[in-house]
Amino acid sequence: MLARLKAAFTAWPYCLATYVALIGAGWLLFVPFEPVRRDPTVYPAGNPQLAAETAAKALDGRVWAVSHTGSMKPLLQGGEYAVTVKEYPKVKLGQVLVYNATYHNTPIIHRAVDKDRHGWLMAGDTAKQSESWARVTEQNYLGTVVAVYRKF
C-alpha cells in the first residue's frame, strides 16, 4: 500500500495524474462556484405596474406582482412587477421562472439551477442549496421572467 502511494506521487506518469487530480480537487474546494445567471432586464419606471402591463400586452405575456420575501435578492427586492412569457420548451439554465409549487398555494418566482428527468430544479438566489422539493414541469410552469419593472 505504501509503495503504491509513493509511486502515485513519484513515478511517471502516475505522478502527473495524481497532481492534476489534487489541483482539480483543490480548485473545486477553494474557488467559489458561481451559478449560471440569466437575469431579466430591470427597468425603472414612474408607474411600474402600468409599464409592466404595457410590456406584457406587447409580448402577449402576463404580469406578476413580486412580494417582499427576500428569496431573490438582489435581483428582486419586492414591490416590483415581473413580465413573463410562456415558452417552456425554451427554458434555459439560470433563467428566472414563475411556477406553482406543490408545497405552496401561490405562484413562486425562483431561478432554474438544474434539470433532471423530473423537471427543472429551482432555488432562490439567497438559498445556499437548491430547494429540491420545487421542480418545474410543463404542468406547473407559469412563465419565464423577461422583464422586471420597479419604481425609480
Q: Which residues does each predicted region cover?
A:
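Protein maturation boundaries and topogenic segments
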Residues: 1-90, 148-152
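A residue-level detector for short acidic-glycine micro-motifs
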Residues: 69, 114-116, 143
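Residue-level recognition of conserved beta-strand edge/terminus positions
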Residues: 84-85, 100, 144
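Short coil-to-beta transition motif at edge beta-strands of beta-rich domains
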Residues: 88-101
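Short beta-strand-centered aromatic/proline hotspots
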Residues: 95-96, 108-114
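Short coil-to-beta-strand transition motifs
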Residues: 101-110, 135-140
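Short strand-connecting beta-turns/loops that link adjacent beta-strands
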Residues: 104, 117-118
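Extended, hydrophilic extramembrane loops/domains of integral membrane proteins
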Residues: 119-152
